[in-house]
């Protein structure tokens, strides 16, 4: 769910599109979803995956440009989100996703966990390039500009212009925490603000979250990733409550 509507994506691997077929059946036929806008055409030839979509607020979304999500797919999604009358999204931020180990999507590097608090991999904060998408003058078109102000300010603007709290667990390139980042430390499933489902094996990261005032629910990484994906992208909600 994004901005009051749903994105039914085109997966990179053909066999995984059957998962989206099931979701499309639910959205099309279940009365709870009657009239729900659809922002992306599942039959598109351009790939877009849910792990690259991170909701930042009711009016802003981050979209990862990665090996699994193409720029043309982001253009199509941006047009729907920014121009459809049923969408609450006014700003979209495209963030280039680092390619590090087996982490493929934006949600493996960035997780909103409580209002203005985010877990961020220093690799993303340090190296990623970002672009701001807004409505252009001509109806249906999108204006893109490079963001030069850094990730913290981007997230601050997306959540209301106030300073945000960024939590990192140390340098993801070196030291013992490098294993935990590769093991999904920054890919967190928020059950509610400050109430987090995390990979049990990431002991240092989970301790840091507790020290930051979060409630953690450790689950084995084998269980969290049993569907061949990250904990967030495998559990994207079909309904969201306003905060």
Segments (PLM) and residue ranges:
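The feature marks the mature, well-folded catalytic cores of soluble enzymes
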Residues: 1-243
């Amino acid at each position: 769910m994004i901005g009051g509507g749903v994105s039914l994506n085109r997966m990179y691997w053909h066999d995984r599109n059957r998962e989206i077929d099931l979701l499309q059946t639910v959205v099309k036929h279940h009365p709870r979803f009657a009239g729900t806008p659809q922002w992306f055409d599942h039959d598109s030839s351009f790939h877009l995956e849910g792990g690259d979509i991170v909701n930042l607020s009711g009016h802003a979304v981050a979209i990862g440009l990665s090996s699994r999500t193409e720029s043309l797919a982001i253009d199509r999604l941006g047009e729907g989100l920014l121009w459809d009358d049923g969408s609450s999204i006014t700003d979209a931020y495209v963030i280039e996703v680092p390619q590090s180990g087996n982490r493929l999507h934006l949600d493996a590097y960035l997780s909103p966990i409580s209002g203005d608090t985010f877990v961020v991999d220093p690799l993303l904060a340090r190296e990623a390039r970002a672009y701001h998408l807004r409505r252009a003058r001509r109806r249906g078109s999108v204006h893109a500009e490079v963001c030069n102000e850094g990730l913290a300010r981007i997230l601050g603007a997306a959540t209301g212009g106030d300073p945000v709290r960024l939590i990192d667990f140390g340098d993801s390139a070196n030291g013992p925490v490098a294993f935990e980042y590769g093991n999904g430390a920054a890919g967190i499933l928020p059950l509610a603000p400050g109430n987090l489902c995390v990979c049990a094996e990431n002991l240092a990261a989970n301790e840091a979250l507790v020290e930051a005032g979060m409630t953690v629910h450790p689950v084995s990484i084998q269980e969290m990733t049993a569907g061949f994906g990250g904990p967030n992208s495998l559990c994207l909600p079909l309904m969201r409550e306003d905060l």
